[in-house]
């Protein structure tokens, strides 16, 4: 008896070493090692030299602690953009940077040293800070590399580098030369815990419980406008500022009423009277007199705690939204108070020291910390008969961005940038920038419009010193250009530590300095340091203009939406002054913050923090990268365990699609086996048309930075177009055709083009997986060693055929209708697999009938429906009304019956078998293929 033939061995089943299980946490580090061995960054830079430049300037993360989800999101977005730019034909260098000065690092260094900063030599403290910052630079560098981010990691920019510091001095000097740097007494944000001034960008607003008090000041001189026994009523949530009260402000156009009460004749805005009486538990009353705020100007009152007489003044900042419409004014503790006080020549009283403790000027409260003094001040007001009511409120209040404690407004002598002098120049520069999304322009405009002068001095040690020498005789600062040149020269050679090592004379230009005010020749160095936002805000000069591979301005800045008031703003302000009105960037892209699935901010207290290191450990960096691409970054970006699982599921579908494509290309050589367009089967030409549409959509989405569209397009293409339709239809042809037949090579040609295009389009996003797939893809001779050196695919017009696509779209519509009927037959167990079925189609044959289309494609229909046979009945044949029947599109009806014939042992279709004697269990097609393979064992 002849030995039975193993027909399975005659099938072209998929085979590939590209694993089904990704095992990314293990494989990704192996890939990183390979990239390191090939010196990937420099390899790419050499290969792209001479192309047009695309420069994304890295906003420097702070070198303090592990990266968090927001940092990871930011770096991944940048990497997607840079890699796409390379593959789109640009030379796209990426120089990562770090912000390495500043308060958080200094505080941590002091904590580690367990020492009071007043008792340590500044150079010793700075050395510790330098060491601490570089430790975290190295930690973060490895964490960023683990994300798959490609960059010049061995040569990053650092705001502590001598060359950077020298350039920053030059920027400062350029601003000073134009008169935009000055020293002055003004109220600024002050952190009594960190003992330093803060800029607006260093403030965050959090919930705080504060005292809410209503206070009456007895009128001294009513100037004939108020009755005897009148009181001015103010409301405040900062009782500690009452000792510094020097005026009461009213709005000139607001109506005020005089209300006769058991507490005297109380003056409040009529619009707020009802709320006021409720708040202080007084019976509602009608005013005995009304007058405009302008009538109250010049009236005086007595501050009973200090027996001080002060005036009523006018201020447009006064509103009737809350309180009484009369504003307690302390020029030493508020920006608006200070401004209006200057108009009236009020002194600036600031009875609070650097630590937030009252000085002797506060009288009985001297020595008390302001927050602890609040109850004592309230008690004193009550005893003096000034307190009308008290309570507590929850409200948004300014906090220090680093120590998270409440800050105060405090008038001190600080260094400022006179923003008002060039605000209009900055606004004009904004018109030459592309803002992504568009609302970024309005956000930025709001930050610049009416911006208060920028406080740039900090009372700390770890930072770039304010490069100013001041006359020791009259305290007049020097802005001599040659002085700035000398300071920059020394910093370039020695770093800014030289400021603490060298005497002031060393920083003077040749011939010394002469004070322009008093003629003095002796100068001393400024003790304050520069705001870190001045550091990073100067990076466009310190990096873009000093690194030969980069260009000024940058093509793109990309950061979170909080940077409109941070790096975007500080960079714009320094650039328009130092570089003659030009912005430092051509485009600014903004992304949202990371939140949990419910849209809540991530916090340890809520237990909803997602650690990128944990995600990488459990899922791999490519899952994190896919999440970044899948989410519309223009809004806040949600991540949770549930969302991670959804992303991982989408990743598996993409990976399985790649694996299937590669598995069917094991014997395909693109140099010798490619089928020309006109020789492709029609369904394959249709799929090539679909591929061009996908490429076109993805190309446009990449160009517009819309990565969520890239993701959804490719995800749907893999899951629907390929896996659910085309690849399903192809299986019979791929597996059962002769290996080198036109039918199989036609399919493989398409699979190669699809795999090649997918790898290219996925490389910027799934950077590890695309590289892994590329290593398993059959490649033409001369292909680059990494997918990152491939070019992005471009739509090929030769494959775009709208008429063909319209026909096949109709056939796919019919396929959907057939599958509905097949499923009913399967549920009722008429059939098991769809190959046990045959389909009968009934068409009317009239005008607009499907008959012509179906007749032309009749040989293709069994493979399209994945059934054993399809028959078409046109015109007079009446459609059945049996169980397995359904309406198709248009004039079609669909019937499913069991297929006739026997099951072919090789292809499993039901057809006539045994036509070829040597293979009695095979259909004629399969027997012919087997004979051609010379594998007959019969």
From Swiss-Prot:
Keywords: Aminoacyl-tRNA synthetase, ATP-binding, Cytoplasm, Ligase, Metal-binding, Nucleotide-binding, Protein biosynthesis, Zinc
Predominant location: cytoplasm
GO BP: isoleucyl-tRNA aminoacylation
Location in or out of the cell: Cytoplasm
Cofactor note: Binds 1 zinc ion per subunit.
Chain ranges for the short sequence motif 'HIGH' region as given in the UniProt record: 61-71
Binding site for L-isoleucyl-5'-AMP: 559
Domain of life: Bacteria
Binding site for Zn(2+): 904, 907, 923, 926
Quaternary context: Monomer.
Comment field on protein domains: IleRS has two distinct active sites: one for aminoacylation and one for editing. The misactivated valine is translocated from the active site to the editing site, which sterically excludes the correctly activated isoleucine. The single editing site contains two valyl binding pockets, one specific for each substrate (Val-AMP or Val-tRNA(Ile)).
Stated name of the protein: Isoleucine--tRNA ligase
């Amino acid at each position: 008896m002849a030995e039975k033939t193993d027909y399975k061995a005659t099938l072209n089943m998929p085979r590939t070493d590209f694993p089904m299980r990704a095992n990314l946490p293990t494989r990704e580090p192996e890939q990183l090692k390979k990239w390191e061995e090939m010196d990937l960054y420099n390899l790419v830079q050499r290969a792209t030299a001479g192309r047009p430049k695309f420069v994304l300037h890295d906003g420097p993360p702070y070198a303090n602690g592990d990266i968090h989800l927001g940092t990871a999101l930011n770096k991944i977005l940048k990497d997607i953009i840079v890699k796409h730019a390379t593959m789109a034909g640009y030379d796209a260098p990426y120089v990562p940077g770090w912000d390495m000065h500043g308060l958080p690092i200094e505080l941590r260094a002091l904590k580690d040293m367990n020492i009071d900063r007043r008792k340590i030599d500044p150079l010793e403290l700075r050395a510790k800070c330098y060491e601490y910052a570089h430790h975290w630079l190295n930690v973060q560098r490895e964490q960023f590399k683990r994300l798959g981010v490609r960059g010049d990691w061995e040569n990053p920019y650092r705001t502590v580098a001598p060359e950077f510091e020298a350039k920053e001095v030059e920027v400062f000097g350029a601003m000073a030369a134009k008169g935009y740097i000055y020293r002055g007494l003004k109220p600024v944000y002050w952190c009594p815990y960190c003992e330093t001034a803060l800029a607006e960008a260093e403030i965050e607003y959090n919930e705080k419980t504060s005292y809410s008090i209503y206070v009456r000041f007895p009128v001294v001189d009513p100037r004939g406008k108020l009755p005897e026994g009148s009181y001015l009523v103010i409301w405040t949530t900062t009782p500690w500022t009452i000792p510094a009260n020097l005026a009461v402000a009213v709005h000139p156009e607001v109506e005020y009423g005089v209300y006769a009460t058991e507490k005297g004749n109380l003056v409040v805005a009529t619009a707020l009277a009802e709320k006021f009486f409720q708040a202080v538990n007084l019976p509602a009353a009608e005013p005995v007199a009304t007058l405009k705020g302008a009538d109250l100007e010049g009236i005086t009152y007595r501050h009973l705690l200090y027996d001080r007489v002060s005036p009523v003044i006018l201020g447009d900042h006064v509103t009737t939204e809350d309180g009484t419409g009369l504003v307690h004014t302390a020029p030493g503790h508020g920006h608006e108070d200070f401004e209006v006080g200057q108009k009236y020549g009020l002194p600036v009283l600031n009875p609070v020291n650097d630590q937030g403790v009252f000085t002797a000027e506060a009288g009985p409260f001297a020595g008390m910390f302001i927050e602890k003094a609040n109850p004592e001040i309230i008690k004193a007001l009550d005893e003096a008969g000034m307190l009308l009511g008290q309570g507590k409120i929850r409200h948004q209040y300014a906090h220090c961005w680093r120590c998270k404690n409440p800050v105060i407004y405090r008038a001190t002598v600080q260094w400022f940038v006179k923003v008002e002098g060039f605000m209009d120049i900055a606004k004009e520069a904004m018109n030459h920038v592309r803002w992504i999304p568009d609302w970024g322009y309005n956000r930025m405009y709001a930050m610049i419009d009416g911006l208060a002068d920028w406080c740039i001095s900090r009372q700390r040690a770890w930072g770039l010193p304010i490069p100013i020498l001041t006359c020791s005789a009259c305290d007049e600062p020097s802005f001599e250009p040659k002085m700035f040149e000398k300071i920059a020269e020394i910093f370039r050679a020695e770093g800014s530590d030289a400021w603490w090592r060298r005497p002031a004379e060393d920083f003077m230009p040749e011939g010394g300095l002469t004070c322009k005010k008093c003629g003095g020749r002796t100068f001393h160095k400024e003790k304050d340091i520069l705001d870190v936002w001045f550091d990073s805000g100067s990076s466009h000069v310190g990096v873009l203009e000093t690194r030969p591979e980069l260009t000024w301005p940058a093509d793109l800045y990309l950061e979170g939406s909080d940077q409109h008031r941070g790096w975007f703003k500080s960079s714009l302000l320094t650039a328009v002054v130092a570089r003659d009105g030009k912005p430092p960037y051509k485009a600014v892209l903004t992304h949202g913050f990371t939140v949990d699935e419910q849209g809540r901010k991530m916090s340890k207290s809520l237990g909803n923090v997602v650690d990128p290191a944990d995600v990488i450990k459990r899922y791999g960096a490519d899952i994190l990268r896919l999440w970044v691409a899948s989410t519309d970054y223009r809004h806040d970006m949600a991540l949770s365990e549930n969302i991670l699982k959804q992303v991982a599921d989408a990743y598996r579908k993409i990976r399985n699609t790649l694996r299937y494509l590669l598995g069917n290309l094991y014997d395909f050589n693109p140099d010798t086996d490619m089928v020309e367009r006109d020789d492709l089967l029609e369904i394959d030409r249709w799929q090539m048309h679909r591929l061009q549409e996908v490429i076109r959509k993805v190309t446009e989405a990449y160009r517009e930075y819309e990565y969520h569209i890239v993701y959804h397009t490719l995800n749907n293409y893999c899951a629907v177009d390929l896996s659910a339709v085309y690849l399903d239809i192809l299986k019979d042809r791929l597996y059962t055709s002769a290996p080198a037949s036109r039918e199989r090579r036609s399919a493989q040609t398409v699979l190669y083009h699809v795999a090649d295009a997918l790898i290219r389009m996925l490389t910027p996003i799934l950077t590890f997986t695309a590289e892994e797939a590329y290593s398993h893809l059959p490649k033409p001779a001369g292909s680059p060693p990494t997918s990152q050196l491939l070019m992005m695919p471009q739509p090929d017009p030769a494959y775009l055929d709208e008429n063909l696509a319209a026909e096949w779209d109709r056939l796919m519509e019919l396929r959907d209708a057939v599958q509905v009927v097949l499923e009913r037959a399967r549920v009722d167990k008429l059939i098991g697999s769809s190959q046990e079925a045959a389909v009968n189609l009934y068409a009317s044959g009239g005008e607009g009938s499907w008959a012509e289309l179906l007749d032309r494609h009749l040989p293709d229909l069994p493979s399209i429906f994945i059934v054993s046979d399809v028959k078409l009945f046109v015109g007079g044949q009446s459609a059945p009304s049996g169980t397995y029947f359904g309406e198709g599109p248009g004039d079609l009806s669909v019937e499913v019956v069991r297929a006739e014939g026997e099951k072919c042992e090789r292809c499993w279709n039901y057809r006539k078998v045994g036509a070829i004697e040597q293979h009695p269990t095979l259909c004629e097609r399969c027997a012919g293929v087997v004979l051609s393979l010379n594998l007959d064992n019969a």
